[in-house]
Amino acid sequence: MTAAHVAAPEPGQYELSHLRLLEAEAIHIIREVAAEFERPVLLFSGGKDSIVMLHLAIKAFAPARLPFPVMHVDTGHNFDEVISTRDRLVAENGVRLVVASVQEDIDAGRVVDNGPSRNPLQTITLLRAIRENRFDAAFGGARRDEEKARAKERVFSFRDEFGQWDPKAQRPELWNIYNGRHRKGEHIRVFPLSNWTEYDIWAYIGAEGITLPGIYYAHTRPVFQRDGMLLAVHPYMQPRDDEEVFETSVRFRTVGDVTCTGCVESTASTVEDIIAETAVSRLTERGATRADDRISEAGMEDRKREGYF
């Protein structure tokens, strides 16, 4: 079999880089949703992926303002740096922020806080907020390289009237043809970063000069080991009597609820350092630092079936 010959670009021919192709794809998806749906929302935690999502969404509609709100499902167990970054970005860009509070659901008796982690309770709060605000599409920052359940999910991911996902009943998705059809009460989760990797995210952050919470970069803080993970000492995450606290240089690869988010030992204090570190990593960020994904082999898929991000 003869290999197909790919002609070199003609002099002066415009050619997009890998990062710009990913950016163009994501912006196309965001604009498609804005045109097709009545009440979209962007899920925004203040973490690196949702910050990149917000950056892309603002680019998609500039110089106009973002035509939909952003929503944070707030467990109440947050890193202070992440919340301050969230509030600053929302204020700087004139974006409407909807905060869906897990604490409100606990106080109202809709969920029971059995501790220590509130991460499993987010699903109820997320689905309530989608229902109350009548959102018919929700942008998420999930990527296929993060975890195997996310690897098989469509860019336009259908959710039934209960917010549930059925991985065996996913719609065909050919090239850039997306199916957003749904009935009243149903909605679509949309993942414009599906084809990005952690490396791509950091390369884009560097190329665009995007500001992140300081905890993504190396810093010294007290930590302790638990179940093979480094956890930060925090008012919501305290060591047990047999767990030794020590100080070391760490950074966070992913950020979520304090009680289930681990850090990694690192001296990478710049975007360039992190890109170099990511290039040689053999563990996904969630596999290395998220306790909520270690519940079982199918932990993420089980939660997504129930309506998780």
Curated annotation (Swiss-Prot):
**Cross-referenced PANTHER family, in alphabetical order?**
SULFATE ADENYLYLTRANSFERASE SUBUNIT 2
The protein's gene is named cysD
Enzyme nomenclature, EC number: 2.7.7.4
On whether Hydrolase is a keyword of this UniProt record, the answer is no
Q: Name one GO biological process term.
A: hydrogen sulfide biosynthetic process
Keywords of the record, alphabetical order, are: ATP-binding, Nucleotide-binding, Nucleotidyltransferase, Transferase
Q: Which InterPro entries match?
A: PAPS_reduct_dom, Rossmann-like_a/b/a_fold, SO4_adenylTrfase_ssu, Sulfate_adenylyltrnsfr_sub2
Main function: With CysN forms the ATP sulfurylase (ATPS) that catalyzes the adenylation of sulfate producing adenosine 5'-phosphosulfate (APS) and diphosphate, the first enzymatic step in sulfur assimilation pathway. APS synthesis involves the formation of a high-energy phosphoric-sulfuric acid anhydride bond driven by GTP hydrolysis by CysN coupled to ATP hydrolysis by CysD.
Q: Which reaction does it catalyse?
A: sulfate + ATP + H(+) = adenosine 5'-phosphosulfate + diphosphate
> Organism's domain of life?
Bacteria
The protein's organism comes out as Mycobacterium sp. (strain KMS)
Which pathway does the record list? Sulfur metabolism; hydrogen sulfide biosynthesis; sulfite from sulfate: step 1/3
Q: Does the keyword Nucleus apply?
A: no
Gene Ontology MF, one: ATP binding
Q: What is this protein called?
A: Sulfate adenylyltransferase subunit 2
Family, according to the entry, reads as follows: Belongs to the PAPS reductase family. CysD subfamily.
Q: How does it assemble?
A: Heterodimer composed of CysD, the smaller subunit, and CysN.
The family database entries (Gene3D superfamilies) matched by this protein are listed as: HUPs
